[in-house]
């Protein structure tokens, strides 16, 4: 199974079934090492040392993405609300983009929805949908190849 992603005006909605329980999915979205492992999807890499996470409303997380040509881009987000292990909302201050990550228990894992609102015009393109889909597919691969360990547990 692969991710599905759909553009609707200034919104992008991507969905993916994941082979892990909601707590592991949550930790993947909030752990610097896991974020580095999947965030670049098929189109970029994320140097692990570039990822910072301050998991609280008003806290930031940031990371660098490195394209195949070596171009690096710093991404910065601010957490709006945190409801572990089911919902994470964060904004990208530069573009005004708001992302809501929802994790629901499902048979054999969890169902993940990533809903981005207020997409700027330059991101309302098929390439953005494909990119988000590839990130969710990379997350699924990461979860399949990494066993649950104590650090997967939320506090």
PLM region descriptions:
Residues 13, 24, 60-62, 87-89, ...:
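General beta-strand recognition
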Residues 13-14, 33-72, 151-155:
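Short beta-edge strand/loop motif at the mouth of beta-sheet-based domains
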Residues 22-23, 56, 80-85, 102-111:
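A short, structured loop/turn motif at beta-sheet edges
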